[in-house]
Amino acid sequence: MTGFSLDPRLQADTVPVCDLQLSAVRLMRDSHYPWLVLVPGRPGLVEITDLDETNRARLMEEVALAARALKAVTGAHKLNVAALGNRVRQLHVHVIARFESDAAWPNPVWGGPRMKPYEAGEMDALVERLRAALGQHSERG
């Protein structure tokens, strides 16, 4: 990841889960929704199309892996996957567990209720469960 640095907003809004071959997997601090963010560890990326063909395919595999792990850990009714980048230009992909009972359902999470921090220990427990689900595929588990 030479020359790579995480955008300060992503750094502030997320905590590390693990590193996959291409991407850092991070958990949003918002307890309204179990929400992963995958950030490819290459400098200067804004769009998915900025990745070469090999890394673009790798990113899609890592998104699928993260989505399967998140669904297995949370029992989500639906997964939302998006790469927007309107506020944070650094390429990152959101993988969000959605529930019919969640604070924004059925609308998008953006523009919903204000961020709600996890209770003490709750975020750490979720990170550990996600690491276990992703562990056999990560470079750091």
Residue ranges and their predicted role:
Residues 1-141:
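HIT superfamily nucleotide-processing domains
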